[in-house]
Amino acid sequence: MGSLEVEKTAIGWAARDPSGILSPYTYTLRNTGPEDVQVKVLYCGLCHSDLHQVKNDLGMSNYPMVPGHEVVGEVVEVGPEVTKFKVGDTVGVGLIVGCCKNCRPCKQDIEQYCAKKIWNCNDVYTDGKPTQGGFSNFMVVEQKFVVKIPEGMAPEQAAPLLCAGVTVYSPLNHFGFNQSGLRGGILGLGGVGHMGVKIAKAMGHHVTVISSSDKKRQEALDHLGADDYLVSSVNEKMQEAADSLDYIIDTIPVNHPLEPYLSLLKVDGKLILMGVINTPLQFVSPMVMLGRKSITGSFIGSMKETEEVLHFCKEKGVTCQIEMVKMDYINTAMERLEKNDVRYRFVVDVAGSKLDQ
């Protein structure tokens, strides 16, 4: 099927200002280009970074803005040069929808680190149109930035894997923490953290959840399958656990001290930062020098890794713990997410919300 001759409209829920309140918004889709697919959105996960975007926490938001970057949908149209997909395929779209294709990261297939990457919302596409995300009934996306959902995987389960899942999988894969027998820590038990526990366990790791309080202990151990649980304020237990972990995945999205967690790492251990924090973090250099430890970061994952994590989770039977909501609940869901009142990922039933009615 070729390019659309007439622009189509989409109906989404958009923020109009830094209040972050979403309401219905009709806008024009860009034409389906030669390598584009048009996707009817079925489900879309709600990520903490959506809150940052709609509330202008990073000072870079443009309005109106339709958020949502854990998108699962059905292909309803393909451009004439599309080879990877056909009408009727169930597919996923993540945070990145464009890149330069010429820089070193692009040539190494780590396009998420391209300096000219295009975000799926709050950005401008190559044709000059604003990009809008998955809290909408339709999207048009270049085939390079679309992945096929494995047959037999529930689409609502696939949605969180497109951000939360690959965000954990990518650093474990890149830094060589993907063999069995390792000891890992998961700091923070939200949407990304709960996927960290499940994916690390599926890789055969001994997993310790680290939290600021004891309230999630039973959930972590009994429901998510973690092996141990540490409360960071209990000094005796933290000291007993010193030098015990190969890595820590730090998912906390607010400013917090690093030194208590650096002490848990073995020699050559890595503290991997994933939370978006807009204020400086502090530590004293001997904390890393005296164990050759590293503080590093990781940002989502490549398209290749996104495909890998989908198949990994399908093969290992890894599922996300989700709470399904309709679009008219989205503002309440965002308020609850800000209070960490969700176990563990909201997924919006976009198609079931009947946005066009």
Curated annotation (Swiss-Prot):
Keyword Coiled coil assigned: no
Disulfide bridge partners, by residue number: none
One Gene Ontology cellular component: cytoplasm
Catalytic activity: (E)-cinnamyl alcohol + NADP(+) = (E)-cinnamaldehyde + NADPH + H(+); (E)-coniferol + NADP(+) = (E)-coniferaldehyde + NADPH + H(+); (E)-sinapyl alcohol + NADP(+) = (E)-sinapaldehyde + NADPH + H(+); (E)-4-coumaroyl alcohol + NADP(+) = (E)-4-coumaraldehyde + NADPH + H(+)
Residues noted as binding Zn(2+) 1 in the record, renumbered to the chain: C47, H69, E70, C163
GO molecular function: cinnamyl-alcohol dehydrogenase activity; zinc ion binding
Expression sites by tissue: Accumulates mainly in the placenta of red fruits, and, to a lower extent, in green fruits placenta, pericarp and seeds.
Pathway connected to this protein: Aromatic compound metabolism; phenylpropanoid biosynthesis
Residues annotated for NADP(+) binding in this entry: 49, 167, 188-193, 211-216, 251, 275, 298-300
Every Enoyl reductase (ER) domain range: 20-348
Binding-site positions, Zn(2+) 2: C100, C103, C106, C114
Keywords: Cytoplasm, Lignin biosynthesis, Metal-binding, NADP, Oxidoreductase, Zinc
Cofactor: Zn(2+)
Keyword Transferase appears in the UniProt entry: no
Entry's cofactor comment: Binds 2 Zn(2+) ions per subunit.
EC assignment: 1.1.1.195, 1.1.1.-
Coiled coil start-end: none
Class of this enzyme: oxidoreductase
Protein function: Involved in the biosynthesis of capsinoids natural products (e.g. capsiate), non-pungent alkaloids synthesized from phenylpropanoid intermediates in the placental tissue of sweet chili pepper fruit acting as repellant on herbivorous mammals. Catalyzes the reduction of vanillin to generate vanillyl alcohol, a precursor of capsiate, a non-pungent component that accumulates mainly in the placenta of mature red fruits, but also in green fruits to lower levels. Involved in lignin biosynthesis. Catalyzes the final step specific for the production of lignin monomers.
Family: Belongs to the zinc-containing alcohol dehydrogenase family.
Name of this protein: Cinnamyl alcohol dehydrogenase 1
Gene: CAD1
